[in-house]
């Protein structure tokens, strides 16, 4: 039994990893070796012989056992890039009864440089909300270059479903040291193009460029408690075909198909729209649709809408209840994440239109507040 490397997975949101790196940086003297030895003892104690990932929590120079996953994990490539070891091949060979091809000393001798893996998820990180962003990927251009690898889960034209994991792909980068790996990862993410759905790339870049990350001062709660994502905006429209083309704005319209309502977003020319007002036509410019809101139906309308497709997992209010503006009324699950849908005004619950387990579409009214 050998241990290959440590990894750090502290950059998380909702206890789900965003960025992983190997080896774990800023560990105290002897900590990495002690972790490796503890991992080997754990595997031997239960008679486990295959690829496994042992997780620890590290704080103030001490580490504590969390769990053991009897498999490789999503971030295993970041270990591969600093060792040159194909961990999947090793897993298969061990499962077929072969012996490990290297000793502990040989594994240690192969380690070189630093690796970073960034998960590209179909989520909108605007305002730090990380709302699911299902839809069709109209264009995907992967980064490349020396020390850069991209493991893709989707291609241009594929649709990211609301029912499954929204991992679009993984950017894995190697550098001769941690600062080089960080700089190379930033360059790779800035080169990557994903259109059609929002992704976590803006949040990933904010993390990598932050001085706390460079100084290893971040923790598992750092993204949610310290990282400022207020400046992150929803995806921009595609560039016009030529310089003389009219600028585009995002418009949203609601359509109904077989009794189901859907919000359809379109990028259209920014031209005046004629609306009736006081018996006379009046020109009004369209406005860009707001993104990431927890409740729709207009400000203070009382019609609480869900912003995306999903499943209602919990109803938090009943008819007759008094609620405050911003209070959660239902919990919506989409893409394996729970989202609290909130009241847009204070009042009394007049109607609850859904129950736990119901499937809803974007724009559906779930609660009416009078």
Model-derived segments and their meaning:
Residues 52, 169, 250-251, 300, ...:
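Residue-level marker for the onset of beta-strands and adjacent loop->beta junctions
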Residues 288-370:
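Structured functional modules or segments
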């Amino acid at each position: 039994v050998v241990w290959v490397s440590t990894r750090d997975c502290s950059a998380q949101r909702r206890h789900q990893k965003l960025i992983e790196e190997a080896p774990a940086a800023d560990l105290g003297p002897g900590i990495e070796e002690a972790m490796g030895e503890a991992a080997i003892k754990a595997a031997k104690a239960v008679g486990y012989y295959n690829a496994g990932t042992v997780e620890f929590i590290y704080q103030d120079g001490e580490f504590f056992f969390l769990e053991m996953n009897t498999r490789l994990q999503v971030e295993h490539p970041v270990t591969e890039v600093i060792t040159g070891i194909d961990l999947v091949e090793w897993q298969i060979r061990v499962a077929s009864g072969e012996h490990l091809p290297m000793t502990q000393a040989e594994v240690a001798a192969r380690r070189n440089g630093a690796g970073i893996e960034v998960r590209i998820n179909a989520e909108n990180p605007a305002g730090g909300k990380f709302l699911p962003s299902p839809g069709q990927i109209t264009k995907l251009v992967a980064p490349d270059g020396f020390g850069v690898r991209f493991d893709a889960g989707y291609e241009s034209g594929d649709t990211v479903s609301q029912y499954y994991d929204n991992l679009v792909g993984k950017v894995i980068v190697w550098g001769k040291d941690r600062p080089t790996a960080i700089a190379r990862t930033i360059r790779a993410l800035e080169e990557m193009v994903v259109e059609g759905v929002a992704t976590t790339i803006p949040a990933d870049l904010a993390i990598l460029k932050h001085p706390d990350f460079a100084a290893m001062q971040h923790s598992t709660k750092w993204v949610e408690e310290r990282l400022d994502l207020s400046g992150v905006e929803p995806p921009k429209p595609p560039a016009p075909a030529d310089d003389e083309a009219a600028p585009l704005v995002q418009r949203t319209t609601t359509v109904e198909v077989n009794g189901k309502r859907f919000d359809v977003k379109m990028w259209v020319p920014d031209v005046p729209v004629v609306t009736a007002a006081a018996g006379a036509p009046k020109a009004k410019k369209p406005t860009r649709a707001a993104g990431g809101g927890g409740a729709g139906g207009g400000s203070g309308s009382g019609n609480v809408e869900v912003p995306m497709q999903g499943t209602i997992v919990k109803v938090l209010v009943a008819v007759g209840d008094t609620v405050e503006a911003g209070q959660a009324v239902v919990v919506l699950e989409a893409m394996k994440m729970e989202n609290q849908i909130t009241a847009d005004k204070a009042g009394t619950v007049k109607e609850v239109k859904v129950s736990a387990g119901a499937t809803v579409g974007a724009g559906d009214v779930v609660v009416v507040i009078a």
